[in-house]
C-alpha cells in the first residue's frame, strides 16, 4: 500500500506497456513536479475487443486441440497468444514456422489473428506451449518508422510558450499516455517499449497474459494527500493550535492545525471588524471569506475556536514526511508563495545586490527551473573521462517506497527523491508548486511509477504548465549555460553524443550561493531555513508559513554567508535579519556580532528567558553501580516541546553533567548564604591575607568567593558533548532551536553512604579488652536454686522431604527448618509461624548494626511530571546487588509517589514546630470550639499524630500488600536477607510545583490598551 500519500491511486496498463521512461512533447512550458497523481491511463496502439470472451479453464485445454486467438506481444524468443484461456500461451520462435526463423516479428505482429495448436499444458504452473498453424494478415494498426525522434533545440523549447495540443504519432514499440486529471486529458506523452530484460510490473504482466484493455490495481492509501481539503471537529484546544478529528476513507484521523497555520472564522469577529471586512470585499465583487488571517498578537485560539465546532482545513504534512502525524493549514501554496516573494521584495535594494544580479542573469532563461545539482558533475576524481562523469548522476542513490509497502504488485515502484525549485514563468519568479528530482533516475519506470510522474500542473495563477521529465532527459540537458559559467565550466558534446566539460581559461572563483548551485537544494535550503523564523512579533521576521518556500527565504540572507547566519542564529536565538545585520556591523566576527545583539537586546533567547515556563520534565540519572544519583526538573513552556527530542537530549545531558561535577546549585546567584558565610570566614582566616589591610583583604575574599560561586554553579559547567561550551550556552541554543523559554529549575544529588560512619574492625583493641576482662577477679558464684525438671518431649521424627518443603517455603536454613518441625510436631503452618517469629526477633537485633552500603535509586512516573530519588542502605554490597533488595527499593520508591503527603522517612524526623503547627490548626477548628480545653487538646493531639503518620513513609501501607506497613515489609526483608535495611532519605519533585502558569486575559489586555490610548 502506498503509505500516507493520501488518495486512491488507479493504474491501468495494456499488454504493450512494458514501460520505459516517459518523454514529453515539445511546445510546453516546463516546471518541476513531485507528488502522486490520482490515476494514469496507459493506452495500447490497437485497443482490444470491447468485451472479452468467457475464459477457458486450463483444465479443459487438451493437447492437440486447435484454437483461434490474438497475438498480444512479440518477444525475441517467441510470441504470446490469447486463445481464450485465463493464461496466455507461448508460441516459441521455433514453432512459428516450419523453417528457421531469425526474428519473431517477421512472422507475427501484436493484434494479429492466428490459429494455434496446443502442444503441452501445465495447469499447476499456468503454462501453455503452442504451435502456430496459420495467421491472418496483420492490420496496420500503427505506422512503422525507423526515424529517430530528436529532441527540439533547448533554447527554442524554452522560448516557446504555445499551449496548443500536440498530435503524437506512435512508432513501433511505443504507447501513448494521458493524465487522468480533469481538464488535462488531452495532454499526450509517448512511452517506449522496455528492453527485453527489463523488469515488468504485475500490472503489465497481467495485461500481457490476459489481453485486457486495462489491468486495474487500486492502492488504498492511509492518509489524505498534500493540500487535500478535509473538514473536522475541534477535539482539543491548546495555546499553540487546535486538534481536528476528521473522517477519511472510513477512518477517524486527527490533525494539528497550528497557530502559525491558522485563520479565524470571520463570523467570530466583532461587528465593526465584520463591517470593515465586508466593505473591503464589496469592491472585489466576491463574497466575504469565511476565514480571515489575524496578526499573531490578536490571535487567541481559545477565543475563536470551541470544542465540537466543524472546521475545514488543508492537509499540509502527513507522517510520511517527518513521523509527527498530520499537520493542517488554512493557507494555500498560492498564499504562501505570495508572502515569501513579497517578503523578499520588501528587502532593501542595497542588501541583496548579488541575489538581484543572479535573478537578472536568470531572467534570460525563459521558463527555466533554477534549482539543480551541477556539483555532481565535478565529484569524479581527476583524470577520469568526461563520459564517466555524465553517468555519475544516474548512478546516484535515490529515496523511494519499497515494494514491501505496496499491496497487490511486485514491480519496480521507485519514487524519485525531489526538491523545491524557483521557476520563472509568465507571472515572474515563483516557487515551483511541486519540485524536481535530486538526480536523474536511470531505472525503468513501471506502470505504478507513472502514478508519481504525472503530466501537468497548474501554477499559482492558474496557468497550465508542462512538467519536466527528469527520468529520461539527459543528465545535463537542463543545466543553464550561465550556471556552468559561474562554476567555471564549459560543456560540449562529442560525436557520440556524450557531454564533455572543460574549465574556462578566464574563470575567477567567486562565492557561489549554496542554496542555488551547491548540493541538494531542498535539504540544504530547508536545513538553513528551519530555525530562521521567530515567533517574536517585534522582530519583524518573515512569516512562519514562508518556511514552505525555503528557496525564497534562503535568498533573503545571501550577502552574508548562510553558514555564518545560521551559526549565529543557533547561538543567540536572534532573528534572521537581526543576525544578518549584526554580522554586517561586525565585519563577519561571530563573537562581536553576538555581543552586539546582546547589547541591542535582540537576542531571541534572552527575550524568551522572561517567559513563564511551567511545563517540562522531571528526570533522573543513576550512575552505573547505583552509588550516585541525580533528580532534576527542567521547565519549558508547552508539553509539546517537553516531549521533543531536542529537549529530552538537553535534560539527559544535564543529568550526567550534575553527576560528573561538584555543582551544588543551578546558577551562581543560588549559592546558599550559609555556605558563603562559612567560606568567607575560612578565607578571611588564611595566613596569606593576615598582613593585608582590611579593605584589600575583603576585596580579595569576595573575588575568591565569586570564583567559588562559578565553580559550584551548574550553568558554568562545561558540557559533555562540547567541553568548549558551557551549560548556559547549551540551554540558550536549545531555546533558539525549540522557540520556547527553557529553564533549569532545581536538582539534587545523592551519593551513597555520604556522611555515614562505616564500622571499623580494630582487632588489637578487641584482644586487649578481652585480656583485661580475664585478668579481673572473678565474682563470687551465686547460689543457684535447683531447677525443676520438666518432662522431656517425645522425639518427633522429621523426614527430609518435609524439611525440604519448609525450606522452599520460608527460605530458612536446613537445621532451623528441622528444629521448627520438631518443635511443632511436623505441623507446616505452625513451623512457618515459629520461624517467622524467630526471624523477626533476629531482625530487631540486626536493627542496631551499621548499614552504610545499599543503593541510590529513582522512580519517574509515566509522563515525567513526578519523580523520586531515594537512598536505601544495607550492610554489604553483596546484598545491595541482590534481586530481593532491589525489588524492595523499587516498591518503596513507587509507594512514595503514591502517598501524596509523604514528606519524612519516620515520625522522628518531623520537626517539633511542624507537629505543633498542625496541633494548633486542629485546636482552632469549629467542631472543637464547644468542648472543654483538656478534651479539645487531646483530640487535637490525636488528629495531629494522624496527620504526622500520613507524612511518614514507614507508616504508609506497603504497595504490594496494603495490609502491612512499609516498616513491617522492611522488617520481613531483614529477616529474609539477614542484614539491616534502612531507608535513609528521599526527595520528591513534582513538575511545576509552586510555579505560576500564564493565563491570557485578552479582555483585560484590550481594556488596558484602550485605556492607555
From Swiss-Prot:
Protein name (record): Polyprotein of EF-Ts, chloroplastic
One Pfam family hit: EF_TS
InterPro entries in the cross-refs: EF-Ts_dimer_sf, NA-bd_OB-fold, S1_domain, Transl_elong_EFTs/EF1B, Transl_elong_EFTs/EF1B_dimer, Transl_elong_Ts_CS, UBA-like_sf
Key words of the record: Chloroplast, Elongation factor, Plastid, Protein biosynthesis, Repeat, Transit peptide
Residues covered by the S1 motif domain: 64-133, 227-331
Presence of keyword Membrane: no
Compartment list: Plastid, Chloroplast
Segments for region (Disordered): 141-163, 772-798
Gene name, Swiss-Prot/TrEMBL: PETs
GO MF annotations, alphabetized: mRNA binding; translation elongation factor activity; translation elongation factor binding
GO BP field: mitochondrial translational elongation; response to light stimulus
Organelle targeting peptide span: 1-43
Organism of origin: Chlamydomonas reinhardtii (Chlamydomonas smithii)
Recorded superkingdom: Eukaryota
Biased amino acid composition, Basic and acidic residues: 781-793
Amino acid at each position: 500500500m502506498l503509505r500516507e500519500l493520501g488518495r486512491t491511486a488507479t493504474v491501468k496498463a495494456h499488454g504493450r506497456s512494458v514501460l520505459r521512461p516517459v518523454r514529453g512533447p515539445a511546445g510546453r512550458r516546463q516546471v518541476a513536479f513531485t507528488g502522486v497523481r490520482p490515476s494514469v491511463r496507459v493506452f495500447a496502439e490497437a485497443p482490444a475487443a470491447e468485451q472479452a470472451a468467457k475464459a477457458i479453464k486450463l483444465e479443459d485445454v487438451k493437447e492437440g486441440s486447435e484454437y483461434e486467438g490474438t497475438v498480444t506481444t512479440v518477444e525475441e524468443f517467441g510470441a504470446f497468444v490469447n486463445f481464450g484461456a485465463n493464461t496466455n500461451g507461448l508460441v516459441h520462435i521455433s514453432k512459428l514456422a516450419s523453417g528457421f526463423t531469425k526474428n519473431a516479428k517477421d512472422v507475427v505482429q501484436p493484434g494479429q489473428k492466428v490459429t494455434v495448436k496446443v502442444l503441452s499444458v501445465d495447469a499447476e504452473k499456468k503454462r501453455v506451449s503452442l504451435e502456430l498453424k496459420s495467421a491472418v494478415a496483420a492490420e496496420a494498426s500503427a505506422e512503422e518508422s525507423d526515424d529517430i525522434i530528436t529532441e527540439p533545440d533547448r533554447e527554442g523549447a524554452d522560448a516557446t510558450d504555445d499551449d496548443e495540443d500536440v498530435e503524437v504519432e506512435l512508432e513501433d514499440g511505443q504507447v501513448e499516455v494521458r493524465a487522468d486529471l480533469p481538464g488535462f486529458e488531452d495532454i499526450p506523452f509517448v512511452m517506449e517499449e522496455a528492453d527485453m530484460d527489463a523488469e515488468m510490473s504485475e500490472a503489465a504482466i497481467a495485461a500481457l497474459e490476459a489481453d485486457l484493455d486495462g489491468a486495474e490495481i487500486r492502492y488504498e492509501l492511509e492518509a489524505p494527500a498534500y493540500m487535500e481539503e478535509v473538514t473536522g471537529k475541534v477535539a482539543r484546544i491548546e495555546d499553540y493550535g487546535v486538534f481536528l478529528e476528521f473522517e477519511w476513507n472510513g477512518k477517524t484521523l486527527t490533525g494539528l492545525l497550528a497557530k502559525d497555520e491558522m485563520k479565524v472564522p470571520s463570523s467570530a469577529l466583532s461587528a465593526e471588524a465584520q463591517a470593515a471586512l465586508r466593505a473591503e470585499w464589496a469592491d472585489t465583487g466576491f463574497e466575504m471569506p469565511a476565514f480571515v488571517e489575524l496578526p499573531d498578537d490578536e490571535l487567541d485560539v481559545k477565543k475563536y475556536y470551541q470544542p465540537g465546532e466543524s472546521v475545514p482545513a488543508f492537509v499540509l504534512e502527513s507522517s510520511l514526511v517527518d513521523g509527527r502525524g498530520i499537520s493542517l493549514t488554512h493557507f494555500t501554496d498560492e498564499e504562501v508563495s505570495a508572502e515569501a516573494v513579497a517578503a523578499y521584495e520588501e528587502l532593501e535594494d542595497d542588501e541583496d545586490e548579488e541575489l538581484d544580479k543572479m535573478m537578472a542573469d536568470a531572467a534570460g532563461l525563459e521558463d527555466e527551473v533554477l534549482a539543480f545539482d551541477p556539483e555532481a558533475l565535478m565529484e569524479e576524481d581527476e583524470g577520469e573521462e568526461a563520459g564517466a562523469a555524465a553517468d555519475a548522476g544516474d548512478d546516484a542513490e535515490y529515496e523511494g517506497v519499497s515494494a514491501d509497502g505496496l499491496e497487490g504488485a511486485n514491480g519496480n515502484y521507485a519514487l524519485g527523491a525531489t526538491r523545491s525549485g524557483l521557476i520563472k514563468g509568465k507571472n515572474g519568479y515563483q516557487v515551483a508548486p511541486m519540485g524536481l528530482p535530486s538526480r536523474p533516475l536511470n531505472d525503468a519506470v513501471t506502470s505504478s511509477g507513472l502514478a508519481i510522474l504525472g503530466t501537468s500542473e497548474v501554477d499559482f495563477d492558474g496557468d497550465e504548465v508542462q512538467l519536466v521529465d527528469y527520468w529520461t532527459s539527459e543528465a545535463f540537458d537542463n543545466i543553464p549555460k550561465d550556471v556552468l559559467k559561474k562554476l567555471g565550466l564549459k560543456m560540449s558534446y562529442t560525436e557520440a553524443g556524450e557531454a564533455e566539460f572543460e574549465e574556462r581559461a578566464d574563470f575567477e572563483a567567486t562565492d557561489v550561493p549554496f542554496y542555488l548551485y551547491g548540493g541538494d537544494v531542498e535539504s540544504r535550503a530547508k536545513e538553513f531555513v528551519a530555525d530562521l523564523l521567530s515567533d517574536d512579533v517585534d522582530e519583524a521576521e518573515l512569516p512562519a508559513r514562508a518556511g514552505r518556500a525555503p528557496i525564497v527565504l534562503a535568498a533573503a540572507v545571501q550577502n552574508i554567508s548562510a553558514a555564518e547566519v545560521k551559526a549565529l542564529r543557533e547561538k543567540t536565538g536572534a532573528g534572521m535579519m537581526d543576525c544578518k545585520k549584526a554580522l554586517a556591523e561586525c565585519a563577519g566576527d561571530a563573537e562581536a556580532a553576538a555581543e552586539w545583539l546582546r547589547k541591542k537586546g535582540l537576542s531571541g533567547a534572552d527575550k524568551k528567558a522572561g517567559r513563564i515556563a511551567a511545563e517540562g520534565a522531571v528526570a533522573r540519572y543513576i550512575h552505573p553501580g547505583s552509588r550516585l544519583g541525580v533528580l532534576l526538573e527542567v521547565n519549558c513552556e508547552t508539553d509539546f516541546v517537553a516531549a521533543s527530542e531536542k529537549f529530552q537530549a538537553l535534560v539527559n545531558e544535564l543529568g550526567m553533567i550534575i553527576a560528573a561535577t561538584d555543582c551544588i546549585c543551578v546558577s551562581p546567584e543560588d549559592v546558599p548564604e550559609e555556605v558563603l558565610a562559612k567560606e568567607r570566614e575560612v578565607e578571611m582566616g588564611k595566613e596569606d591575607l593576615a598582613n593585608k589591610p582590611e579593605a584589600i583583604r575583603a576585596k580579595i575574599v569576595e573575588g575568591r568567593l565569586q570564583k567559588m560561586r562559578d565553580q559550584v554553579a551548574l550553568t558554568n559547567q562545561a558540557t559533555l558533548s562540547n567541553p568548549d561550551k558551557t551549560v548556559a550556552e547549551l540551554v540558550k541554543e536549545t531555546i533558539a532551536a525549540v522557540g520556547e523559554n527553557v529553564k533549569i529549575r532545581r536538582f539534587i544529588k545523592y551519593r551513597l553512604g555520604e556522611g555515614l560512619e562505616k564500622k571499623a574492625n580494630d582487632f588489637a583493641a578487641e584482644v586487649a579488652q578481652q585480656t583485661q576482662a580475664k585478668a579481673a577477679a572473678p565474682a563470687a558464684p551465686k547460689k543457684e536454686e535447683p531447677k525443676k525438671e520438666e518432662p522431656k518431649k517425645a522425639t518427633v521424627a522429621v523426614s527430609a522431604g518435609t524439611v525440604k518443603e519448609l525450606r522452599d517455603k520460608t527460605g530458612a536454613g536446613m537445621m532451623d527448618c528441622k528444629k521448627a518441625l520438631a518443635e511443632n510436631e511436623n505441623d507446616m503452618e505452625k513451623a512457618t509461624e515459629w520461624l517467622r517469629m524467630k526471624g523477626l526477633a533476629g531482625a530487631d537485633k540486626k536493627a542496631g548494626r551499621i548499614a552504610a552500603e545499599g543503593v541510590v535509586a529513582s522512580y519517574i512516573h509515566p509522563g515525567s511530571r513526578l519523580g523520586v530519588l531515594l537512598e536505601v542502605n544495607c550492610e554489604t554490597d553483596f546484598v545491595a546487588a541482590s534481586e530481593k533488595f532491589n525489588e524492595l527499593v523499587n516498591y518503596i520508591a513507587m509507594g512514595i509517589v503514591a502517598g501524596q503527603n509523604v514528606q519524612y522517612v519516620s515520625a522522628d524526623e518531623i520537626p517539633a514546630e511542624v507537629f505543633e503547627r498542625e496541633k494548633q490548626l486542629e485546636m482552632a477548628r469549629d467542631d472543637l470550639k464547644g468542648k472543654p480545653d483538656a478534651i479539645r487538646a487531646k483530640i487535637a493531639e490525636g488528629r495531629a499524630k494522624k496527620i504526622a503518620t500520613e507524612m511518614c513513609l514507614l507508616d504508609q501501607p506497603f504497595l504490594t500488600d496494603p495490609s502491612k506497613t512499609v516498616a513491617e515489609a522492611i522488617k520481613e526483608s531483614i529477616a529474609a536477607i539477614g542484614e539491616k535495611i534502612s531507608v535513609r532519605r528521599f526527595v520528591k519533585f513534582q513538575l511545576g510545583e509552586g510555579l505560576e502558569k500564564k493565563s491570557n486575559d485578552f479582555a483585560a489586555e484590550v481594556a488596558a490598551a484602550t485605556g492607555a490610548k
